[in-house]
Each structure stands twice: as C-alpha cells, then as structure tokens.
C-alpha cells in the first residue's frame, strides 16, 4: 500500500532529475527548436514518415550549421565538422547501434561493424578488391561495358518496339545488379537485362519499403512486432539463395571479392556465414545506390529545358569526339557525374556516429561522450558559399579551378575517411561507362507517358525516386 502511495512521488523525482540533467547538458545550449532539448520524438516521427532528411535540412536553414536534433543528437553541416566526425584518427568516431540493422544472415559485416578498430582489421583484407587499380583492370571494365551495352540494347528494343519508351528505373537497376555481381562473383554474375530470373532478383532487392519496420526495430524493439504485422518486411528468398549458393562455388575470378573472401576463409577462422554475409551486404549496397543515382541523372538530362538539353548536348559532343580516350580522362563526363552525385547523392541522409569517451569539441562546441553526431550529404552539398546556385545542375562548377579545394572538402556523396564507401571507384566506373555507352550515340527525352514522381523518397539510409519508374525515349543520333 505504501509503495503505491509513494509511486507518484518517485515518478515525479525521476522526471525532474531527467529534466535537470538534460537542461545542464552542453547539448541543451546548442541552436535548435526548444522542444529538441527535451525530446527526440519529433525527429523520430519525421524519420518514420520518410521525412528525416528534409526536416534536418530545414533546421539547418533556420538555425545554421550546428543544430540540436534531440537531447542526445546533433547535426552538423560544415567541412570541419565532417572531418572531425568521420576522419579524426583515420576513420572517425565509432558507428552507433543504428548500423546493427544491416547485419546479414545474423552476422556483422564490414559496414555493420561498430568499433573502428574492428572495422580497420576487416577492411585490411577487402580494400584491395575495390582499389581503383583493381577496378580499372580490363576484366572488370570489359564486363561492366558489356552490361552497359545490354542496357542500351534493351532500351532501344523497347523504344523501337510496341512500348515506344524504356523504363530506365528497371533497366538501370538491372545494370547496377549486373555490374556489382560481376565484381563480386565473376564468372557467376547476373545478366538481369537479358535473363528473367535475374530480373526477378533485382525486383526483390529494389521494390520494397522496409523503413517503418527498421525504424521500429531500432527505436522501439518492443513495438516492432506490431509494426511487422501492419507493414511486414519483405522476404528475400531469391537474393539469399543466390548469395548462399554462389559464395560456395569454386574458382571465382582472381579479381573478384569472392576470391579474396574464400582465400581468407581458408587461411583464418571466420564465422560460418561470414563469406555470404559480406557478399550479400555488398550486393545490397551496390544496386540501389548506383541505379538510383543514374536514374535521377538521366531523368534530369532528358528534361525539356534549355539547361538540361545544353548539358546533354555538351556531353554527347565530348563522348562522340573522343571515342578512343579512356573514360577516366574525359573532363566533362567527370564533371557531369560529380554534379549528379552532388545533386542526387545515393546516400543523402545522416551517417550517425557516437562521440568518444571524454567528449569532443566540434565547431567550437563541446559535445559530451555518447552523443550521436552526424552530417548529411543533402545539406552539405547545398552550401551556397561553396556551391553558388546550389539547386541548379551546373557541371561546369567542377571544371573551375577556383574553389576546387572547398568543393572537394564538402563533397560527401561517399561519406569520407576510413569508413567511407568502399565501392566508390566501382560506382563511378559504372556510371561513366553507362553514360558513355548511351550518350556517345543516343539522345534521350521524356516519354509522353512519363508521369511518375521523381522526388527523392527516403528509405532507411538511402533515397530513391518516389514513383520507382522513369520512362524515356532513346533516339540514335549517329
């Protein structure tokens, strides 16, 4: 009886203690809406409803480069902050438990490993597979080029057939799947632009929405069962079967990731599912990112505006007149790809990290240990002091030597530091080879049947075209 009489007082004392702790925290003195000193529920609401990226961007526009998102989370939007968070000590601060959502087959992978020391150890035996020297090998480039030809042939067949248009969202994600599996598994890669089963594999990987269930698992594990019932996560039997079977096949090509992983598994004691888990993680990471970035870019180049048609014309001119020049030595192509990654970064959202023991000073503010800190590419890439007219697609900005260092410091499409995107060189090679194949010989325009929403829609860590469809017409010009 006495316990129940005293319970309200215990609750009141606990609430008051928590309130005092939050008000005394250095985080409470940072810029941001007043409610964020007390709760992160508004942030979680926007995340649950696909709006976290735009919510944070709006806060930065109002409050400046340092914004409190909640009692224990802060967002930054400067090059110095990004350097401190993601590059200090070589690989920046440790990842937060958020990345535990990305385990595969119950096994932690390079991406989902939290402590940077463990990540550094794992990266040592994988990094050379994604080094530019490996990606530039003829065996890899020839394979990607063939997949680019498959993409263009499929699009031309559809345009000159009964459809009269090509849905490049589908074909680009097929191309991205084929490109990444070529590097992962050759000679056991996919041919999704030619093979119906591989097409279904791509659809399983790309046509799903697991944001709500993942957010529930992370923030409210006790509620995840209810959310799973309302919005069940989509199973992935085809991709799981493909990865499990393929990762056990013998004699993969020496340049492949599978070759390196199998050799490592023989030389050391690895977890039972370590090889397929790592392969599945790289497979999932390499499809939507490259496919979405190319889709946003080709849609923009095909818009019926003078600005878009000018860029497409200049790109065609450089590619058509320099057929024998290596793709990595074409300045305008490079500028178009960089501007695409600035305007449509494959992962535009926050990359959360945890402030280490003892706390840190970021942008002149002391941030206590355990605080979640992050930057998001979407906001960094729109700094008007570094990128004048940030909402305009201007490849020429990357050809200007003035301000080059500042632009590169804020370029965050692949994150930065030792934990930045391992596959950046592969992604850029895929984008450039695909664009060269298409725009050296074709012109693209929007189909009259193109009515899909091309706004960015946030997923758990990446964003994609909301309508997941982009209908273009391809016309041969040579």
Predicted feature descriptions by range:
Residues 2, 14, 463-478:
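C-terminal helix/juxtamembrane-tail motif
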Residues 2-121, 145-150, 353, 358, ...:
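N-terminal membrane-proximal hinge/A-helix region immediately C-terminal to the signal-anchor transmembrane segment
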Residues 46-56, 321-363:
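Conserved cytochrome P450 K-helix E-x-x-R motif and the immediately C-terminal K′/meander segment
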Residues 93-103, 137-294:
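Cytochrome P450 heme-thiolate monooxygenase catalytic core
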Residues 176, 180, 264-316, 340, ...:
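Central I-helix of cytochrome P450 enzymes
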Residues 190, 306-307, 406, 424-465:
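Cytochrome P450 heme-binding "Cys pocket" and the immediately downstream C-terminal segment
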Residues 320, 375-402:
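Conserved cytochrome P450 K-helix/beta-meander segment immediately N-terminal to the heme-binding cysteine loop
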Residues 340, 367-370, 393, 417, ...:
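Hydrophobic, well-ordered secondary-structure elements that form the walls
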């Amino acid at each position: 009886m006495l316990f129940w009489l005293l319970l309200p007082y215990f609750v009141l004392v606990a609430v008051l203690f928590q309130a005092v702790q939050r008000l005394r925290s250095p985080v409470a003195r940072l810029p941001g809406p007043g409610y964020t000193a007390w709760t992160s529920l508004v942030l979680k609401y926007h995340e649950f409803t696909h709006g976290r990226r735009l919510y944070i961007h709006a806060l930065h526009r109002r409050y400046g480069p340092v914004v409190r998102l909640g009692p224990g989370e802060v967002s930054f939007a400067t090059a110095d902050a990004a350097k401190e968070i993601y590059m200090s000590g070589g690989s920046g601060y440790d990842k937060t438990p958020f990345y535990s959502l990305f385990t595969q087959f119950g096994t932690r992978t390079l991406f989902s490993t939290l402590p940077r020391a463990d990540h550094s150890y794992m990266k040592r035996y994988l990094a050379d597979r994604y080094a530019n020297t490996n990606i530039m090998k003829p065996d890899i480039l020839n394979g990607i080029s063939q997949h680019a030809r498959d993409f263009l042939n499929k699009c031309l067949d559809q345009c000159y057939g009964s459809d009269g248009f090509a849905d490049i969202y589908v074909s680009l994600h097929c191309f991205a799947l084929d490109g990444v599996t070529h590097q992962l598994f050759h000679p056991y890669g996919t041919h999704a632009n030619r093979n119906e089963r591989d097409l279904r594999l791509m659809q399983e990987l790309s046509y799903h929405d697991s944001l709500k269930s993942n957010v529930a698992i992370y923030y409210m594990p006790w509620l995840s069962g209810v959310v799973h019932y309302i919005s069940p996560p989509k199973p992935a039997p085809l991709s799981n079967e493909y990865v499990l079977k393929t990762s056990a096949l013998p004699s993969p090509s020496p340049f492949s990731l599978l070759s390196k992983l199998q050799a490592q598994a023989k030389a050391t004691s690895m977890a039972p599912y370590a090889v397929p888990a790592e392969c599945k993680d790289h497979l999932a990471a390499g499809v939507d990112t490259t496919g979405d970035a190319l889709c946003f870019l080709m849609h923009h180049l095909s818009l019926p505006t003078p600005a878009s048609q000018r860029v497409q014309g200049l790109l065609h001119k450089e590619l058509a007149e320099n057929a024998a020049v290596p793709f990595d030595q074409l300045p305008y192509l490079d500028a178009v790809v960089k501007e695409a990654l600035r305007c449509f970064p494959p992962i535009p959202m926050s990359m959360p990290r945890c402030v280490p023991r003892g706390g840190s000073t970021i942008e002149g503010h002391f941030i206590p240990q355990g605080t979640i800190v992050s930057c998001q590419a979407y906001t960094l890439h729109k700094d008007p002091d570094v990128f004048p007219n940030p909402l305009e697609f201007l490849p020429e900005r990357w050809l200007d030597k003035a301000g080059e260092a500042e632009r590169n410091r804020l370029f965050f499409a692949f994150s930065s530091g030792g934990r930045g995107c391992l596959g950046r060189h592969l992604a850029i090679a895929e984008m450039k080879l695909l664009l060269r194949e298409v725009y050296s010989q074709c012109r693209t325009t929007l189909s009259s049947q193109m009515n899909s929403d091309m706004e960015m829609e946030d997923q758990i860590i990446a964003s994609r075209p909301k309508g997941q469809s982009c209908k273009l017409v391809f016309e041969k010009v040579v």
